[in-house]
Regions:
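A compositional/biophysical signature of low hydrophobicity enriched in polar/charged and small residues
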Residues: 1-157
Length: 157
């Protein structure tokens, strides 16, 4: 992968000047390459990695495994693209193994996610199980909890 892209993945706010120093390119060349990556769709956007615990957000993320029958025309793409268009679906992946699709669905609360699953997703043939994340330890390469103290109680016979 291009060194500029690696640096931007680590810190999308890195200055063009600093990227130039780190890569040995001029700041103008760095800016030109980044603009080209954006134009060609190599860079699809920029996001901040948020620690939701610090924001006191009331969001629930559900991980949903979906088994589907491939369509005669379009294989898995037809159903995957249809599911991906739901605004509640934050990410969708084609998987190998027992399940065909892995979805990350977000809602304001458990009731909202459950409503999405029961009213919009479940009517689509093949939804087998739903798993809810309880805690995020690492997101997009960033550790969410720096406190190393272990607050669990010891278990003894």
């Amino acid at each position: 992968m291009d060194e500029i892209l690696k640096l931007l993945q680590t810190n999308a706010l890195e200055s063009r000047e600093n990227i130039a120093k780190l890569t040995g390119l001029s700041a103008a060349e760095v800016a030109t390459r980044i603009a080209d990556y954006e134009k060609r769709g190599v860079i699809r956007g920029y996001q901040a990695v948020l620690n939701e615990d610090k924001l006191d957000l009331d969001t629930v993320t559900a991980v949903i495994e979906v088994k589907v029958t491939p369509q005669r025309e379009g294989g898995f793409n037809t159903i995957a693209e249809r599911i991906s268009k739901f605004p509640e679906v934050r990410s969708a992946y084609l998987m190998s193994g027992t399940y065909d699709l892995l979805l990350f669905v977000e809602g304001r609360n458990l009731r909202e996610v459950a409503s999405f699953v029961s009213e919009r997703l479940s009517p689509l043939e093949g939804v087998l199980s739903t798993h809810f994340m309880l805690k995020t330890y690492k997101r997009l390469g960033v550790l969410m909890h720096q406190d190393s103290s272990d607050e669990r109680l010891s278990v003894s016979p």
